[in-house]
Structures are given as C-alpha cells and as structure tokens.
C-alpha cells in the first residue's frame, strides 16, 4: 500500500513540514557525499543507546539524539518517511500551528529515541531515522482527523487498485507493519 493523498485540505501553507522534509533530504545528500567515511560519521554523530546510558543525558547526547532524527539508512527509509510526512504532516501542522507542530515533531522524535534506548540499553548500533517523529505525526493525525480517508495505491497480486481507505485502517496497517518489521 502506498498513500497518494488524503481527503483533508490544508488551510495554511505547511512551511515547517516542507522545511523538515528539505532538511531530511539535505542531510541524506550529505550522507551520500561521505562515501566510505559515512559509517564512521554516523557512529560519531548519531545516538547510540549504550553511550547514552553510560554517559547520561548530556548536551552532546542531546545533539546526537537530534541528529539521529535526520539520518536515514537508505533511499527507501528516507523516501517512505518523507512520503508519510508529506501526506499527513501538512494537516497536523495546519491544525496545531507552525511552532507547535515543530515542537511536537521533535518531542515525539525524542520520545521514540528514548523508548528505543530504554528498550535496548546495551545496543551499540547507532539510531537513524525520523520514524519515531513520523509515528507521532501519524498518531496526531488519527486523533485530529479520525474520519479522514487516504487515497491509496494497493497491490493485489498482479493487479493494482487505487482506492480510498479510512485513515484509521490505513494507519492501523502501517502501525502493525512497523511492529512486525521491528520484531523481525
């Protein structure tokens, strides 16, 4: 399933949403420019659970937790996150206002990062991605727009359908898939 758009029009220009998408794309372009030194860069600048636990929550760790939200592990990771932010973030920003949306986005990203750190405190793998912040935006979307529908590209074997799916169903499936991929 690939979301194409929702049926909720925005009343304001979603500048923060667009800036977040542009920032994620710019950071990914920077990642690509690093070539072979990318791994070392990520290990130096991303949050690593065991380091956060051993060093405590310092200003340096706060910076790493912020950077973590803008690093991505590949094209699919980046593009899927940005597609969901593009489709659902504009409405959430419209309802919350620009500044509150930015604060909400960052806070849910930090909460997701902390949840991962506390779930896997001995992990030495750097955390990358905006998925936690995106999940926060999707949760807010469901609360704010429970009756919304999502125009969706659905693949059924060799057939492709474009249909409207209730946002509750669409995002429920997304959530289950996230859980399954996280436990695989």
Language-model features, listed with the residues they occupy:
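A detector for small-residue-rich transmembrane helices and their helix-helix packing motifs
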Residues: 1-184
């Amino acid at each position: 399933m690939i979301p194409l758009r929702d049926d909720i029009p925005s009343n304001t220009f979603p500048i923060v949403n667009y800036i977040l998408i542009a920032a994620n794309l710019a950071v990914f372009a920077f990642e690509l420019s690093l070539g072979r030194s990318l791994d070392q860069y990520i290990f130096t600048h991303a949050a690593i659970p065991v380091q956060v636990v051993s060093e405590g929550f310092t200003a340096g760790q706060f910076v790493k937790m912020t950077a973590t939200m803008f690093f991505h592990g590949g094209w699919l990771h980046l593009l899927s996150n940005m597609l969901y932010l593009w489709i659902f973030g504009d409405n959430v920003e419209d309802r919350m206002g620009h500044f509150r949306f930015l604060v909400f986005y960052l806070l849910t990203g930090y909460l997701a990062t902390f949840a991962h750190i506390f779930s896997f405190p001995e992990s030495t793998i750097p955390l990358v991605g905006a998925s936690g912040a995106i999940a926060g935006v999707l949760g807010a979307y469901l609360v704010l727009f429970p009756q919304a529908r999502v125009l969706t590209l659905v693949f059924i074997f060799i057939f492709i359908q474009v249909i409207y799916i209730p946002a509750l169903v669409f995002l429920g499936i997304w959530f289950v898939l996230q859980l399954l991929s996280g436990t695989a």
